[in-house]
Each structure stands twice: as C-alpha cells, then as structure tokens.
Design a protein with these regions (language model features):
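Radical SAM enzyme core and accessory elements
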Residues: 2-6, 26-27, 31-34, 41, ...
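A structural motif corresponding to the C-terminal lobe/cap of the Radical SAM core domain
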Residues: 230, 241-422
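Short acidic/polar active-site loop segments enriched in Thr and Asp
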Residues: 51, 102, 217, 274, ...
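Cofactor-binding loop segments of dinucleotide-utilizing enzymes, especially the Rossmann-like FAD-
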Residues: 8, 37, 87, 224, ...
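Alpha-helix C-cap/termination motif
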Residues: 28, 75-76, 98-99, 214, ...
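Conserved strand-to-helix beginnings and helix N-cap segments that scaffold or border functional pockets
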Residues: 15-18, 63-67, 198, 230-234, ...
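Radical SAM [4Fe-4S] cluster-binding motif and immediate context
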Residues: 152-313
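Acidic, low-complexity intrinsically disordered segments
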Residues: 1-209, 213
Length: 468
C-alpha cells in the first residue's frame, strides 16, 4: 500500500514526526513517501496515487497551514484514507473530520498509525466517507530510530549562527514527549494530562549519529521540557559529548526546573549546550499564577543568574499579549528584558505572541477567561478573545506587523526591539517621557537559530501560501 506523510511546519527543523513513523511503516512492508512542505514542493502524482495520507500536526502554526492542504488532498484523491496525527489533531478532530480526515491520532502516534494503515490495507477501514473516533494513545512505546533519508537534507533547514558570524548545520531529535506539568495555557496538557514519555536512550543517540553523519554540527532537542526526566537527560548529553566532543546542542527547560536542578546546569554547559530556551511567558506574578506556571518573576531573575554563572545562554519565550496584560505591563516586560540584557536573546516574534486558547485548555477553568471569549472558532483553532482595553489589541497587531516586516529585511534584534519599544510608548501616549539606552546593534555575542517564526504564532501570509 502506498502511504504519503506530510508535514507543513516544524520550527525550521527536519520533522521527527515524519521520520519516526516512516520506520514503523517500512517495517510492515508499506511503501512510504514523505513531504515537508516547509522545504519542498508537493508532488501531485504522489498524493493522487496514495491510499493513505497522513498529516503531522504538532502545534498551532502547522495545523493552520495544513488546513487548506488537507482540503486539497481530499478533493484530488477522495478515495484515500486521510489520517491527522500529532498534538493538535485530537483537539481539533471534529473540524478536521469535516475537511475530509478519516482518522485522528494524538499522543504516542506511531503504533496507532501502523494499526490504522494495516486496517486500510486489508479493507477493514470504515468507508472513506465515514470517520473514526479520535484516539489519544498514552501507551509506552519501544521507539525505533527515525528514517530520515527521504527528507530534505539538513543544510536546507534552519541553521545556527555563531557569535563570529559562522553557521552550523542543525539536526533535531526528541528524548521525551509530553510533560508532567499542567500549565493552564499549554496545548500539551489536554492530550498528555501531566504525563511524559521517554524515548529510549539508544534510539536518541543513534538518531543523533545518523544526523551527524549527514552533516549536523548542532542538535536541537525538541522535548517540551528536557528536565522532565533529568536523569535520562543528563545521561543522553553525557553520551552525546563522549561520542562527539565538538557537537553542540540546545534544549528547552522550564524556569522552575532550571532553579530546582541548578546543579545540572554545569553538566549541560560542559557537554556542549550553547543555550536553553525557557517559557517565561510573563514577568507579572499575578499572570504567572493564573497560568499556573510554577515560577515567579523572582525565579526568572534567579534562572538568568544561574545560567550566567556557568556561561550558559538563556533564551526566554513569552506569551506577551494576554487578557490580563496592560499597556504598562507590556512596557514593563520590555524594560525587564532590557535591564536583564536579554534583548539579543529574545526572538522578536516572542514580543508579538498573543495567547491562544485551544479546545480543552485549562484556561477555560477561569471565569474571567470564559467571559472574554465568544465561543470556539474552528477555522482559527481557538477561542477568540478581545482585551478589555482595545489599545492592547491594537498594540499587539502593530507589534506583529513590525516583527513580520522585520523578518523580511533581516534587521538586527536590537533595532526591532527599539521599534517595538517606540510603538509601545506611542500607544501609551508617552512618546517623549521615557529615555532608554538601547544596546548597540553589534553587541550580540549569542548564538541563535535562523528560524524567525514560532509554533504558537499565527502563520504569516507567506507561510499560508503553500502551493500544492
């Protein structure tokens, strides 16, 4: 049986969510093609002749981009079984099914995809016009080394720019999935509900090895929180450094875990970690409490200090625009970033992110959130909301426009930050009242990944114009 697996967006990385199920499907004798539409054009003949088409939907941006592609595939091959899988698939199952999706799989998806594919091959699947109940599998799996040979080569993906201007080819892998925390705004929670799954260490190392052989000089670990299983994590990076002493990497870790497991930060640094991405989200303690983030403003400051003590970069991410933020609060966020000397560590899109409230979000437990929303909007994949102060929504739109335009012209982060600051002061009516000393445009000594956008941001017009 001919199978096609499709990814639309994975933060500029070679998609683990394509490469992993390919191995499982090939082992069962299926003929599998993959298409990463973020990097390559779709081959019409491949989808027309496929009997099973799978769409990998890991987060918001990828799913928004995938919607018109799913519709087009269904129109061009109405007899193909279409499967949507990944974190965002079960949360949007009803909408996806109306687009033509037959099966929906969330959580640990590889084994379920194989099971469905076998049923389709044996003609045991429901009629193509029927749909299955969405499945969320949290069964532990024995992972297999991902098959990456048919994906675009690593050099075509996002690269790492070093302080001296040199570039490194970047690979991507995952050591865990899910998360043991229950942050209210996080889209992982409705699917994994506080559980995380470990990818066996030998699989992770073997996956890294094949990417090093393919030219990877740096590895991004895509785990939602690398320190969910801190013992597992430190064993993997120790083995990584033992095998490839010159290989660098980056990880994502909660502020709470950076503080709690501070003794392991030096291990990260000593084994080649260049920087840690951390979801700070806000510098307002009341907002952090509403989000149930597990850290405070002071903890954020402490994490910055701890990372600097071992010369480990910290790249904060934010949900900058949220129902409880004020104009003054947003200005405080910018001022805090400036005072902590983090301007070059914050990707500009982070200053434009507007809170997304997906189906099943714990934010809907809060009465003041419910009163702000107007019901679930399937096409936008979230509950739309308006700020009680229209000026905040206007500022968010202006900041997003600044960032999107700046991404086209390759402006330095310091210049983008300056423009956002000026727009904020204009929105507050304080154009001439606050004088700020901005860092020079050549002050950055931080490595950073070249991908401009983010998994929780609305896709740009260019991203939505995928040609199939």
């Amino acid at each position: 049986m001919r199978i096609v697996l499709i990814s639309t967006y994975e933060l500029g990385h070679q998609p683990f969510g394509l490469a992993s199920p390919v191995t499982w499907l090939l082992a069962e004798g299926f003929e599998v093609r993959t298409f990463d539409l973020a990097m390559e054009k779709f081959e019409h003949d491949a989808v027309r002749s496929a009997e099973f088409v799978g769409f990998y939907l890991p987060m918001h941006t990828a799913t928004r981009i995938a919607v018109p592609v799913i519709s087009a595939v269904h129109q061009r091959n109405p007899t193909a079984h279409i499967c949507a899988y990944g974190l965002y698939a079960p949360m949007n199952a009803k909408y996806l099914q109306r687009l033509g999706v037959n099966s929906v799989v969330g959580g640990e998806f590889e084994d379920e995809i194989v099971s469905i594919a076998k049923q389709v091959a044996r003609n045991e699947s429901p009629d193509v016009n029927e749909t299955r109940e969405a499945v969320v599998s949290l069964r532990k799996q024995s992972f297999k080394v991902p098959t990456r040979r048919d994906l675009p080569e690593l050099s075509k993906y996002a690269f790492l720019t070093m302080p001296d201007g040199s570039r490194r080819t970047v690979g991507y892998t995952e050591a865990t999935r899910g998360c043991k925390h229950l942050c209210r705004h996080c889209p992982i929670v409705p699917v994994y509900n506080g559980r995380f799954m470990v990818v066996q260490g030998d699989v992770v190392i073997d996956d890294i090895e094949q990417q090093v052989q393919a030219g990877a000089e740096h590895i991004t670990f895509g785990d939602p929180d690398f320190f969910n299983g801190v013992g597992h994590a430190t064993k993997i990076v120790s083995k990584l450094h033992e095998n490839w002493p010159d290989l660098t990497y980056d990880v994502t870790i909660k502020i709470e875990h950076l503080v709690k497991h501070a003794e392991h930060l030096k291990t990260l640094k000593d084994t080649g970690c260049l920087f840690v991405t951390s979801a700070v989200e806000s510098v307002d303690d009341d907002i952090l409490e509403k989000l149930d983030k597990g850290h405070t403003r002071r903890d954020f400051f402490r994490a910055v200090e701890l990372c600097r003590n071992v010369d480990l970069g910290l790249n904060p991410t934010f949900v900058a625009f949220i129902p409880w933020i004020t104009l003054a609060g947003y200005r405080d966020l910018l001022q805090t970033i400036l005072e902590l000397n983090l301007v070059d560590a914050v990707a500009p899109v982070q200053l434009a992110i507007r809170l997304l409230i997906p189906e099943g979000s714990r934010l809907l437990e809060l009465p003041d959130v419910v009163t702000l929303t107007t019901g679930f909007d399937e096409e936008s994949l979230c509950y739309p909301w308006r700020h009680s102060d229209a000026r905040v929504d206007e500022l968010q739109a202006a900041v997003e426009a600044i960032v999107e335009e700046a991404c086209k012209s390759d402006l330095p982060r310091t210049e983008i930050f300056k423009r956002i600051w000026q727009e904020t002061i204009r929105a507050m009516g304080e154009r001439d009242r606050i004088q700020i000393d901005f860092p020079s445009q050549n002050s950055s000594k931080l490595p950073y990944l070249s991908e401009d956008w983010y998994c929780c941001a609305e896709p740009t017009k260019q991203q939505m114009e995928i040609f199939i």
